[in-house]
Amino acid sequence: MTRIDRRSLLKLSGAGAIAAGTGGIAGVLASGRAPAFAQASTVHWLRWSDFVPASDQVLRNKIIPECEKALGIKLNLETINANDIQARITSSVQSGNGPDVIMVLNNWPRLYEASIADVSDVAEEIGKAQGGYYDIARTIDNVDGKWIGVPWAIGGGLLTNRKSWFDEIGYSEGKFPETWEEYRAAGKKLKDAGHPFGQTLGHTFGDAPGFWYPYLWSWGGKEVEADGKTVALNSKETIDSVKFAVGFWKDCCDEGGLAWDDSSNNRAFLSGTISSTNNGASIYLEAKKKPDSYLTEKGTPLWKDIFHTRLPKGTGGQFALPTQFTDLLMGYSKNQKAAKDFLRWVHSKPVFEQWFTSQQGYTDGATKEWEKHPVWNVDPVMLPFRDLPNVGRLVGYAGPPDRAAAEVVTKYIIVDMYAKAVQGMPAEDAVKWAYEELVKVYT
């Protein structure tokens, strides 16, 4: 992933935004024909390459042709590795040319607030029609009453585990280690048996912050105070979390995880190398899709030997870091009106449902409408993902998930704090380093 240094980030955040025009979609749908302005319009939509490939196929094979038929808009869908999205945004904003709509993750919208269009009219319309947005979506994408992006979906990670291997060490019939101490003890037994845990400490967008931020919070650690300005990382709770992480890493984990990206643990689990990893549901869905390809050591389908659980509890509580997905309308776009009509249309219930159903529970909708969807009744192994928007905490805690918090997560400061410690830096020094890096950002 191309890194964004502080100078580039500040320059990017100061770029000008272009106000967006508004336009209703109801008339288009009622008339059954595309509006005149859109006959020759092309909207370029940049997204991540989905960890549920079937969903990208729905977009390409169904949504693209339906978009042109309904709106007269040619949809240019481009998918790339999520780790490359931020570099792409930087180059597009600096050149004033690029995709009209870019889907981003987490609280990244706060980095680009000055370079994106106001989409309040679109977001309010969608939210009102679909039961209102989750607090997480509103907190990230609504700034002082203005929507800087249209929330698309909310994903996140749970522990993906091998049922039979946990059974062998005494965790059967739905039981699972509840605390970090219990999870570490289980992990030591499993690693000694050749089945380590797998967790990344690399610079990768999802699995790294998705594990280490909730881990920090569960010990009572936090980046800043509630004022969003006073850096509070250098605390006993944080130091204790780092000390425990060093032992946890050595006792339980595949130490190659220092260099893993978001796909590495998928491959490790599917190949039978690891027994537990924090991940979205993509491992399970891939194993279920190819039951003859992914087998246990006994030759049985791997997907039947998988279950999902939340991360363990600590002295500070039990948390998750939901992954917010947001569509940004870029300020440089010369297709503001067409892009807004596209956003209204693709986020509307009948269109979005096609994509949402193909996810099979990998993500929740950003609005509360989707927690009642029948997809959650299909497979009980997927059901725990439904509740992630309600149990999550956002980066920047105990302050807001603002631009500074987005810079910290983009620079992987919290992840690197733990990575430095497991590679030999004393816990106190690792925390001091991270504290000083946060001060640079928040000052």
Q: Language-model segments: which ranges?
A:
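Hinge/lid segment of periplasmic solute-binding proteins
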Residues: 105-158, 184, 211, 301-310
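Glycine-centered hinge/linker elements that transmit conformational signals in sensory
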Residues: 184-190, 227-259, 307, 311
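Conserved C-terminal helix/tail region of periplasmic/extracytoplasmic solute-binding proteins
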Residues: 74, 91, 167, 194, ...
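Extracytoplasmic/periplasmic solute-binding protein
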Residues: 143-152, 157, 181-231, 237, ...
